[in-house]
Curated annotation (Swiss-Prot):
GO molecular function: ATP binding; UDP-N-acetylmuramate-L-alanine ligase activity
Recorded catalytic activity of this chain's protein: UDP-N-acetyl-alpha-D-muramate + L-alanine + ATP = UDP-N-acetyl-alpha-D-muramoyl-L-alanine + ADP + phosphate + H(+)
Function: Cell wall formation.
Organism of provenance: Clavibacter michiganensis subsp. michiganensis (strain NCPPB 382)
UniProt protein name: UDP-N-acetylmuramate--L-alanine ligase
Organism taxonomic ancestry: Bacteria, Bacillati, Actinomycetota, Actinomycetes, Micrococcales
Family matches, as HAMAP family: MurC (MF_00046)
Annotated signal peptide: none
Gene behind the chain: murC
Family that this chain belongs to: Belongs to the MurCDEF family.
Length: 476
């Protein structure tokens, strides 16, 4: 994979910008903002998608597939770290000496000079960002924003606003969250992840200390998460903590998780009851952090509570795709044991007497090797049956011996897990197990959501009908 130079000097003018992998959730949102700012935008992606079509309608010229000719007369290239070094567009740009910007560099360049709210953390970034944006709009504010997922009720992951206020989901996975000139920083947690990039837990913590220390106005940070507490102890300036911890500046109590979550927030001696439209204890925690940011931005506390109640979720966060013969099919972006636990606990609060059939696609070979046992323990505790697919490698080369079988082999009861690298077999198995009232939940930040049409088709197939041919995953 490529390693963009995050320290490079960016030209004052970028001219025509070419995005490689423009259909991705983060890239498409940034491309939308470049279009809104009047830039000529071109791009390429491995496949067509709704995001690609939406950008075309806004004026972007987008090619399906990768070819050096697609670069055309571009003045700069925008990429992610999940790009192979032999990508022909990247190779040509290097040969021409074009500026090659990481997506976060491009965004930081575009929004320079604005008051910036940056949301970081190993888990909960996308949801927390969506909550802040939704509540600001409900309160009559008009920020610009870019999120890692489509925000429910808005139908987009990014949009320009009329205020000099920008809300961004900041990606810590490769250190690029340190590029922003942050005014208000929200740190949801500092649960060690991405150690393939950082190398150690200490280096991971250090990055968050740098991120928080750079915030010019306010740091909002969890008081429940041990990693966040380590960071808090090392930073100065205005800090507001949130959580169930009795010492938190904004304390969460009386959480009710039977269906959409409800809870009490106590701040400056005043307690307010809050309710959300999304399930899960973790979303009460996310909402508390968002509330702290909103109040820090000058939103009236009661308006902040009302605005959070309008949040209806984000794409790929416990997202319902279909209900077939009484079986609900959900997708969730969870790709770390902590996130999987939160997603399955949320599912458990709404499934009632039904069962949870989890379809897990391990993400990254390094994470699978390091956390296979942790994943297995969470799934065995909270899912009634788990189907494990093979590893989605993303930016990594395969590691010998590391497959999805590592996860399934860690289950204490082999009767509650299947390792099925063939996607059609996995879809058929999920449909075979499921009965009226059950949930089938796909979990990964890879492309596991693309198995959902196969799952739906398997659920709709009459008993005894011929099975489709095997397939490792849907074709591009």
């Amino acid at each position: 994979m490529i390693a963009p130079d995050l320290t490079m000097d960016i030209p004052t003018e970028l001219g025509r910008v070419h995005f490689v992998g423009i259909g991705g959730s983060g890239m498409s949102g940034i491309a939308r903002l470049f279009l809104a700012a009047g830039h000529r935008v071109t791009g390429s992606d491995s496949r067509d998608s709704d995001a690609v079509q939406a950008l075309r309608e806004l004026g972007a010229e987008i090619h399906v597939g990768h070819d050096a000719a697609h670069v055309g007369d571009a003045d700069a290239l925008v990429v992610t770290g999940a790009l192979w070094q032999d990508n022909p567009e990247y190779v040509l740009a290097k040969e021409r000496g074009l500026p090659i910007l990481h997506r976060s560099q491009a965004l930081a360049w575009l929004i320079s000079g604005q008051r910036l709210v940056a949301v970081a953390g190993a888990h909960g970034k996308t949801t927390s960002t969506g909550m802040i944006v939704t509540a600001l709009l409900e309160a009559g504010r008009d920020p610009s924003f870019v999120n890692g997922g489509v925000i429910g009720g808005l139908g987009v992951s990014s949009a320009p606003g009329s205020e000099e206020l920008f809300v961004v989901e900041a990606d810590e996975s490769d250190g690029s969250f340190l590029l922003y000139d942050t005014s208000v920083a929200l740190i949801t947690n500092v649960d060690a992840d991405h150690l393939d990039h950082y190398g150690s837990h200490e280096a991971f913590d250090d990055a968050f200390v740098r991120f928080a220390s750079a915030a010019s106005e306010l740091v909002v940070i969890s008081s429940d998460d041990p990693g966040a507490r380590r960071v808090t102890a090392r930073i100065e300036g205005r800090v507001v903590t949130f959580g169930e911890d009795p010492a938190a500046d904004i304390r969460i109590t009386d959480i009710v998780t039977d269906g959409p979550v409800a809870f009490t927030l106590t701040h400056d001696g005043v307690s307010r009851r809050a309710a959300l439209r999304v399930p899960g204890r973790h979303n009460a925690i996310n909402a508390a952090g968002a509330y702290a940011v909103l109040v820090g931005l000058g939103v009236d506390p009661d308006d902040a509570i009302a605005g959070l109640a309008g949040f209806s979720g984000t794409g790929r966060r416990f997202e319902l795709h279909a209900e077939v013969r009484g079986v609900s099919v959900y997708d969730d972006y969870a790709h770390h044991p902590t996130e999987v636990r939160a997603a399955l606990e949320a599912a458990r609060t709404v499934v009632g007497e039904g069962r949870i059939i989890a379809v897990h696609q391990p993400h990254l070979y390094s994470r699978t090797r390091m956390m296979a046992g942790d994943f297995a323990r969470v799934y065995e505790e909270l899912a009634d049956h788990t189907i494990v697919l093979d590893v989605f490698g993303a930016r990594e080369d395969p590691i010998p011996g590391v497959t999805g079988a590592l996860v399934s082999e860690c289950f204490e009861d082999a009767g509650h897990v299947d390792y099925l690298p063939d996607w059609q077999e996995a879809a058929d198995r999920a449909a075979e197990i499921a009965r009226d009232g059950d949930f089938i939940v796909t979990l990964s930040c890879g492309d596991v959501y693309r198995i959902i049409p196969q799952v739906i088709a398997a659920l709709e197939r009459p008993a005894g009908s011929p099975q489709p041919a095997a397939s490792s995953r849907p074709r591009e």
